Structures are given as C-alpha cells and as structure tokens.
Amino acid sequence: NGLMTLSPEERPALGIIPMGSGNDYARTLGMKINDPEGAFAQLVRGKVKQLEIGRINDVYFMETMSFGLDAAIAADTTKRRANNSSTEGEALFLTSGLKFMAAGSKGYPCTVSFDGEKDIDLQALIMAFQIGPTYGGGFKVCPHAQPDDGLLTVCYNTKVPIIPHLLALFGLARAGKHVNSRIIKERHLKQAVVTFHKP
C-alpha cells in the first residue's frame, strides 16, 4: 500500500523473499519457498515484469481478498499461528477449515454485482477474489487466475451445500477441482460490488 502512494514513475520494483507460512504470492511468482538464498538468486537473475494488483475501497492487495467462511478460517489461522507456530501452511489452513465446516454454516448473506451486471443475492460461504490461483498454503481456489491478464478472478458458491458435500469440496480445492461443482462458480472480471447484510 505504501508503494501505491507513489506515481508509476517514482515507484520502485518490488522483490520478495518468501518466508511466510502460506507463501501463495511466491507460488504465483514461481519463487523458491522458504529458501532465502534460492529466492535471492532468482531476484538477482530475474527481470522486472508488470503484474496486476487488486483494490478494495482504498486498500490494495497482491494475491487474495476473501470474504465468508474462508475469511473466518484465515482469521483463525492467524490467531493460532500467534499462539503456536508448530503448525504452518496447508496443515494450519486445513485444520481450521475442518473445524469451521464441522460446526456448520448457513453462509453470509450478501448482494454482489460483477462488472456492472444485475445484482445477485448469495449466501456466501466463499467469496474469494484472486490475482493468482492459490491461497491457504497452496489451495487452488481460483485455478484459472493469472497475475498478468489484467483481470481479477473470483470463486463463490451459488448454494450452501450440506456438510458432507462441503467437506468434499474443501478437499477438492487443493487441486482446484472444486470449480467443477454445479454450486461453485469461477469467473474473470474487472470489478465487483459486494454488500454484506450483516457486519
């Protein structure tokens, strides 16, 4: 967000050394994970490339902006990571996901419009806007997202599945196969307006 306060002419190139727990943006960039020397070597040998970023209100994001059950899972993983660093990445996301799904959820009521189209009313369990394909330590939530196509990619549910189906979809998301479900939609877009009916 700090870099985006600068004009394009003043803005320096951004390089990353991926040492996080999920490292999904690093995956999108093809960076070496948890290998500082390897990642540094990639930066030294690499070339500058323009990639897209997303913006929600006045906040920019580089990989994921999500709402619904997945956002609750992300908040839980952040809290758990602060209290205990022994579980990281995919395992942390997976165990938090199973906990929330086992508790059951009717979704989060919202209204969404994609690219100025007609409003859609949803009970959102997932509403993930992606620059690249993965989050949660490698889950391919938007498997067809590309960081340089000039578009965001969104994944959302059109219906709330029963718990066994929800658990199955969660497992399929690791390989991006959940988007083949009739109740999951993935699409590319320029912009969206999302209004949640509860805070």
Task: Please give the residue ranges for each predicted region.
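Glycine-rich N-terminal segment of FAD-binding domains in flavoprotein oxidoreductases
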Residues: 1
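Catalytic core of DAGKc-family lipid kinases
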Residues: 4-125
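Residue-level signal for tight coil/turn positions that link beta-strands
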Residues: 57-58, 149, 198
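Glycine-rich phosphate/pyrophosphate-binding beta-alpha loops
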Residues: 66, 70, 128-142
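Gly/Ser/Thr-rich active-site loops/lids in small-molecule metabolic enzymes
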Residues: 81-92, 137, 143-164
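A generic structural signal for short beta-strands and their flanking turns/coil linkers
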Residues: 106-108, 123-125, 148-152, 190-192
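Short, conserved beta-strand edge motifs with alternating hydrophobic and charged residues
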Residues: 111-113, 128-130, 153-157
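ATP/nucleoside-binding phosphotransfer catalytic cores, i.e., glycine-rich phosphate-binding loops
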Residues: 114-117, 121, 146, 156-199
